[in-house]
Amino acid sequence: MGEAEEKLEPSGPLLPEVQHRSISPLRSRDFLLFWTAGAVDGLGTCASSLFLPLILLGAGHSAGLAGLVASVALVSGLVVSPVAGVFADRWPRKPMMYAAALVAACAMGSVFVTVALGHVVLVHVLVAAAVEQAASATYGAAASGTIRRLVPPEGYTRAIGYLQARDQAVQIVGPTLGGVLYQLSRWVPLLADAVSFLLVAVLSKAIRTDLTPDREGPVAPFTRELAEGLRFVCAEPFLRFVVVWTAGINALLGALYFHAVFASHAQGAGPAAIGLILTLAGVGGLLGALAAPWLVRRVPAARIVTGASWVMVPTAAGLAFASRTWTYGLLLSGVSLIVPSVVVVLQTRAVLVTPDRLLARMGTVLGTAGQGVAVLAPVAAGVLVAEYGGRAVALGCAGAFAGLALYATSRARLVVGEAL
C-alpha cells in the first residue's frame, strides 16, 4: 500500500501559476478556452461525420463505398494517435494543437468546396476524411498532456468531470445540429465542421499557459520513445488495469448499443423510436458526468469501480428480455449514468501516476486500446445477432460483464487513491 500511495503524488512539477489555485477549473481562463475548444470541435465533427455517408450516397456511390470511407478515416486516426503521442511528449503541445486544427479545417474545407460545386470525387473525400481524422488524433494526443498544466491536482476530478459532461452534451446536441444543417443544404454541415476547426485553432492559440512537456536528457530515437510509452503502461499495474477495463467496457457497451438498435428495428421501430434510445442513453451519460465529481468526492474510488462493474451485469441481462424501445433506452441510460464516475476515477489517477514527459503517450495508448475494440463492436454485434439472436448476445454480454466485474474486484487494491 505504501508504494501505491507514493505513486499518487504528481510525477511532474506543476507550474507556479497553477500550483496554489483552488478555484473551479471553469473559472480558469485557459481551462475554459481548452474546454470550449473541445466542445466546438466535437459539435463540428458530429455535425458532419454522420452525414458524410449520405452525401456519398447522394452522389451515386454505394453504401459499401460510403462505409469504406468511414472505416478508413477511423483507422487513420487510430494509427496516427500513438505516433502523435510521441511528438506531443517532445514538442510544445500548444502549437501542435492549433496546427492540427488548421490541417483538419483545410481537409474538411476542401470537401465542402467540392460538394458545394457538385463535384464529389470519392478518392478526394476518402483522403480528406483520413487527413481530418489523423489531424484530430494529433490534436487529441497533444490535448491529453495538458490537464496537469491547466489545473492543480485538487482540481483534476472536477476538471475531468467537466470534460466528460462536455463530451456527453456534444453527443446529444451534435447529431441534431447536423440534421438541421443538412436540411438547409448538404454542404452546410461540412462548412460548419471546417469553421469549427478554425475556431479550435484560435481558441488553442489563445491559451497562455506553457504546455511544453518536461524533458529529461536528449531526445531519444522515435521508435525508442514510442516503445517507452507502451512499456510504461505495461509496467504500471494500475494502467494495465485501465487498459483491460476500458477496452472490455467499450467493446461490450458498443455491442449492447447496436444490439438494442438491431432488436428495435426487428420489432418494427422507426427512426424516431431508435433515436429515442440514443437520446435517453446520451441524457444518462450527461447526468452521470455532471454528478461524477460530487460522487467521486464522497465514495471511495475502489467502490465506484467495482460497484459500477457489477451493476452492468443485471443491466445487460435486462436487455435480453426487454421488448419495448423505451425499455432499451432506460436500461442503456442507466449504464451511461454510472460509467462517467468510473472514467473520472481512472483518468484522475492515470494523470497522477504518469510523469509529465509521458502523459501524451500514456493517453494515446489508453485511447487506442479503448477505441480499437470499439471500432469492431458494430460488426461483431451485427454478426452475432444474425447468427445467434439478440437475446443470446445480450446474455453473452452479461456473462462477459460478470467476468470483467470479477477482474475489477480482484484488482480493487490498485485503485487505492480517493479522488482529490
Which residue stretches match the model-derived regions?
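Intrinsic disorder in cytosolic terminal tails and internal cytosolic loops
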Residues: 1-24, 224, 411-420
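A single, central transmembrane helix in multi-pass transporters
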Residues: 39, 47-51, 183-191, 227-289, ...
